[in-house]
Amino acid sequence: SALASVSSAPLNEVMAFMLRHSDNTLAQLFGRLTALKRQAGNSIKTDTQAVADTLAEQGIDTSGLQMADCSGLTPGSKVSVTTLIEMQERNLTAGIATAAAEGLSIPGLVGTARNRIVTGPDNGLFRVKTGSLDAVTSLAGNVSRVKGGVLS
């Protein structure tokens, strides 16, 4: 008989939580899980390479992508606007990847963007991922169009 058991939310729900609340520890762990799944090793370097390889295999332009870690906290990481847009577009259209798009923070409502864009007719139409370091603040995501469709 079992001495103990552990259960958790499905990974897509954990990823949605990570994105919505900018949980850097979970971000790093998702990089590690990617590397381990790909049998790439067990280090920050193999984590970042596994993530970059996975993005490229999905047809996402990774030109100029530099990842110092998977959390985004270590100085030296760079990502292009093209890479961010292609990731958002894929997340909106690629089956299970839609959980990543749906898990983004909603300005005025939930997550790290809950105190941004809190009033007005556009409230609730944006889903965004916030980011900030000492000298940088960023925002990437998508917006629902009034007449249908989504823009990244």
Indicate where each model-derived feature is located.
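C-terminal soluble interaction/assembly domains
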Residues: 50, 62-152
